[in-house]
Amino acid sequence: MAKETFYITTPIYYPSGNLHIGHAYSTVAGDVIARYKRMQGYDVRYLTGTDEHGQKIQEKAQKAGKTEIEYLDEMIAGIKQLWAKLEISNDDFIRTTEERHKHVVEQVFERLLKQGDIYLGEYEGWYSVPDETYYTESQLVDPQYENGKIIGGKSPDSGHEVELVKEESYFFNISKYTDRLLEFYDQNPDFIQPPSRKNEMINNFIKPGLADLAVSRTSFNWGVHVPSNPKHVVYVWIDALVNYISALGYLSDDESLFNKYWPADIHLMAKEIVRFHSIIWPILLMALDLPLPKKVFAHGWILMKDGKMSKSKGNVVDPNILIDRYGLDATRYYLMRELPFGSDGVFTPEAFVERTNFDLANDLGNLVNRTISMINKYFDGELPAYQGPLHELDEEMEAMALETVKSYTESMESLQFSVALSTVWKFISRTNKYIDETTPWVLAKDDSQKDMLGNVMAHLVENIRYAAVLLRPFLTHAPKEIFEQLNINNPQFMEFSSLEQYGVLTEPIMVTGQPKPIFPRLDSEAEIAYIKESMQPPATEEEKEEIPSKPQIDIKDFDKVEIKAATIIDAEHVKKSDKLLKIQVDLDSEQRQIVSGIAKFYTPDDIIGKKVAVVTNLKPAKLMGQKSEGMILSAEKDGVLTLVSLPSAIPNGAVIK
């Protein structure tokens, strides 16, 4: 019997700068949903990606002295590295510069044009380049006047200056779909979540009247061109939104994924783009005669005490720093526990450290440590088999375990992650209290209470197992460590379905002889200071401290190193290594194999076709049994590694001097 499918998407991110913790928030939330649904037995498809067209990208690339795709490839490598670091379990990564996407955008645009939903006109409005959005005069912030007429202002979204732009444009006649859209809302009351977003869409945008939408531009070239009128570039409203179906192969030679997974179960995004997903996207799908997604969920923003994150304010949080210092689980846990999903939440270093110390180290970590230590002390490490409830406290714990699963499931289905985690932690806290109530240290002094003591241990381990299973969507490491230390090796005991009945560990098991702390406690004062320091804006050139240099060398020393241009023609993972890739490079006169420690930052598909710099006169070496004949140059800063890419015009074998 085929599994029930579940298709979830994040927004596709605009790669004009480094991603911050707000972007990580959306993607981790999507990952939690995907892992939860897989744990329930669904056939899940999880999509994320990047929106890579537009004037802003064109200008950024020009400023960097690169082609658009060269600039984008570097930015996307950083995004993929962050997703890998966050252990995002996406099944696909769509780039709007990919042919599979552009092909769909072209066909969709021409179809809408042919059937009269798109028409040619002229557009004039106040345009913000960073936001890639037009605004009406009434929407502008800090409008500037001259002789009673508006001559400028700022974007209500970003605060950037706007400019008056007039250009020929194609328009999407969305106004004719107004009644049909409202009817869909009525028939599908849970389509937009939280409900407050639905009211906002109806009262602020639909009831005042939907204006037809400008869906092409002639003021820049970087994008998908309209096939029948190439001076026009398809604008973001169609280009970006179509990714959700282009990634499934819609209008391709193989539509099997589209037929299997569409419509999407959840489109996940931050609240500032809910309008595009709850108004424009449904109307676009109606025009294409396609089923509409089942749910659009708009979460809130991660705010700081002084408002939105901003580099100039010195309050931007880099998720890389949190992961590197405190671990992935602590970072993912904080994001999903502290911030109520669907509402705005405030990030504070104090709360991050407190959650790590009290919830993870004290409540969960100490429970695991105490339990294993008692089993080693009282039963020489062998956990007695579960015997059922022997007194009222056992019955109470078993009932609470089953009720916890029920409440957790209800919260997860409604995407209330902080509530789901709170439910699990109430159960963990109650289990800690159960130790104090049953007093194992007293029972151990009375041989007649040996069975009772053993059953207390069995209940503790079963409760910990319940918690570990429920935490699997959120924490990618701790549940595995808990199962390992408890020596629970049967995969079926790690599955969600195993929680339907309490007390499945009916055979004795040997726990680890020496429990290891899963979450070490943090020095609160020092770590709060560290996080605050990491949030400061970058130093100016005058403020930067000189980076210690290596000893100077003369030109003769440098001349000993031979560096040549090469193209990566093949790559694969080295077996039994999570760090190494085995790479084949073309040096024109020869091909070589190089083993490189970049697997945590790049997949094989990411690097095939890249032009790189190779040190060719290193002595051959063996790494994990694989011969390596050189070294590919890379750059590293703040724990992020990036390959040194060369312009494609440089021929293979060219010597770099």
UniProtKB/Swiss-Prot annotation:
Q: Where in the cell is it found?
A: Cytoplasm
Q: State the InterPro entries in the record.
A: aa-tRNA-synth_I_CS, Anticodon_Met, M/V/L/I-tRNA-synth_anticd-bd, Met-tRNA-synth_bsu_C, Met-tRNA_synth, Met-tRNA_synth_2, Methionyl/Leucyl_tRNA_Synth, MetRS_core
The UniProt GO MF terms for this protein read: ATP binding; methionine-tRNA ligase activity; tRNA binding
Which keywords does UniProt give here? Aminoacyl-tRNA synthetase, ATP-binding, Cytoplasm, Ligase, Nucleotide-binding, Protein biosynthesis, RNA-binding, tRNA-binding
Q: What EC number(s) does the entry state?
A: 6.1.1.10
Q: What class of enzyme is it?
A: ligase
Q: CDD domains attached here? A: Anticodon_Ia_Met (cd07957), MetRS_core (cd00814), tRNA_bind_EcMetRS_like (cd02800)
Positions occupied by motif 'KMSKS' region: 308-312
Chain location of the short sequence motif 'HIGH' region per the record: 13-23
Instruction: Give GO cellular component annotations, separated by semicolons.
Output: cytoplasm
tRNA-binding domain residues are 557-657
Statement: the UniProt record of this protein carries the keyword Transmembrane helix: no
Q: Which residues are noted in the entry as ATP-binding?
A: 311
Q: Does the keyword Transport apply?
A: no
Q: Which Gene3D superfamilies match?
A: 2.170.220.10, HUPs (3.40.50.620), Isoleucyl-tRNA Synthetase, Domain 1 (1.10.730.10), Nucleic acid-binding proteins (2.40.50.140)
Any one of the GO BP annotations: methionyl-tRNA aminoacylation
Taxonomically, the superkingdom here is Bacteria
Quote the catalytic activity from the record: tRNA(Met) + L-methionine + ATP = L-methionyl-tRNA(Met) + AMP + diphosphate
Please name the PROSITE patterns in this protein's record: AA_TRNA_LIGASE_I, TRBD
Task: Give the protein family.
Answer: Belongs to the class-I aminoacyl-tRNA synthetase family. MetG type 2B subfamily.
**What is the annotated quaternary arrangement, including any partners?**
Homodimer.
Task: State the function annotated in the UniProt record.
Answer: Is required not only for elongation of protein synthesis but also for the initiation of all mRNA translation through initiator tRNA(fMet) aminoacylation.
Under the heading PANTHER family, the entry gives:
METHIONINE--TRNA LIGASE, MITOCHONDRIAL, METHIONYL-TRNA SYNTHETASE
Listed name of the protein:
Methionine--tRNA ligase
